[in-house]
């Protein structure tokens, strides 16, 4: 493996090998990360990286597109089948690019949007002032109820009536509960707004019925193709006939040039994998593992925002431990447990410190771990957070983590295991 790269650029080859070792020997609990299959990686590493294909299948600006046309059409058809929509655009390079395309298709600069507060679990592209969405549009925010930690739909409705937004965004990057897309569509209809559902984190759960679907409620749906969907890093837009032409034009030529055909091939492979019965079993296990991990963390005396989880992630409020999210992240890194610092609702700490950490189960579930392993992981996390400066203890836990991981190979190692 990597023999050509090692001969051409041994420095990069060595860094890739070291990253592979990190993934192999550590627990990946970042909620937005996962492991793609070898098939997806092979598609991404193929000769398709050499091909330009501006336009859509059958309507290209370049010759020689007969095979990439077939690949992209397969990706489109499989995405529509997977989510139950009539139209899909598989070209966005990322979830952020998908959101940019939707905003530029449906809005004019200065239009009003209503999105979820970033520190309440939303996403940068839903109106954060440091993002294009917060710079180009008049943004107002909704959030979670301080008592329950869950979306306050009554407050959302009141704000929508007051500001009459042109677009309401639903979806989040750090929200552990189910989203009521039907209620959000009712609110949108009441004020004449469009509803965009960003399901980047929960797409794999939505596709398998493990989370209510926004299809039939949202006018437009965006997502990434990695995370719980377990494909390559990229974006996807789902819609009906009403918005298809606008969205397609907004992706190209509006916000992008040539699509990444090697990534689109990887998306097609991942969508095909997600259509198989075993993927439904995988998605169900993600939620079971998340529930077990949340219960284990609670048993360790840790506080969870909203009290638990309904999906693939949980948010730990660290204020009772005296640690910031950044401190907890560093200590867990030393124990070979990877999480990310994350804001909690109304967080008093700045974004690079935070008062919380976000934890998710998609990657460890891909490795085959189940509820028993979640109980052990919770115990390790509890111990690290209790003794974050005990280097000997952290090294011991890292060794124990590596031993557990040895029994649950990442996809890149499965060929050797077989």
Swiss-Prot record:
The protein's Enzyme Commission number: 2.1.2.1
PROSITE patterns, alphabetized: SHMT (PS00096)
Keyword Transferase: yes
Top EC class of this enzyme: transferase
Pathway(s): One-carbon metabolism; tetrahydrofolate interconversion; Amino-acid biosynthesis; glycine biosynthesis; glycine from L-serine: step 1/1
Compartment list: Cytoplasm
GO molecular function, one term: glycine hydroxymethyltransferase activity
Site (Plays an important role in substrate specificity): 226
Residues binding (6S)-5,6,7,8-tetrahydrofolate, per UniProt: 118, 122-124, 242
Cellular component terms (Gene Ontology): cytosol
Catalytic reactions on record: (6R)-5,10-methylene-5,6,7,8-tetrahydrofolate + glycine + H2O = (6S)-5,6,7,8-tetrahydrofolate + L-serine
Signal peptide, first to last residue: none
Alphabetic keyword roster: Amino-acid biosynthesis, Cytoplasm, One-carbon metabolism, Pyridoxal phosphate, Transferase
Cofactor(s) required for function per UniProt: pyridoxal 5'-phosphate
Family annotation (CDD domains): SHMT (cd00378)
Gene Ontology process terms (BP): glycine biosynthetic process from serine; tetrahydrofolate interconversion
Domain of life: Bacteria
Function: Catalyzes the reversible interconversion of serine and glycine with tetrahydrofolate (THF) serving as the one-carbon carrier. This reaction serves as the major source of one-carbon groups required for the biosynthesis of purines, thymidylate, methionine, and other important biomolecules. Also exhibits THF-independent aldolase activity toward beta-hydroxyamino acids, producing glycine and aldehydes, via a retro-aldol mechanism.
Subunit structure: Homodimer.
Family: Belongs to the SHMT family.
Protein name listed in UniProt: Serine hydroxymethyltransferase
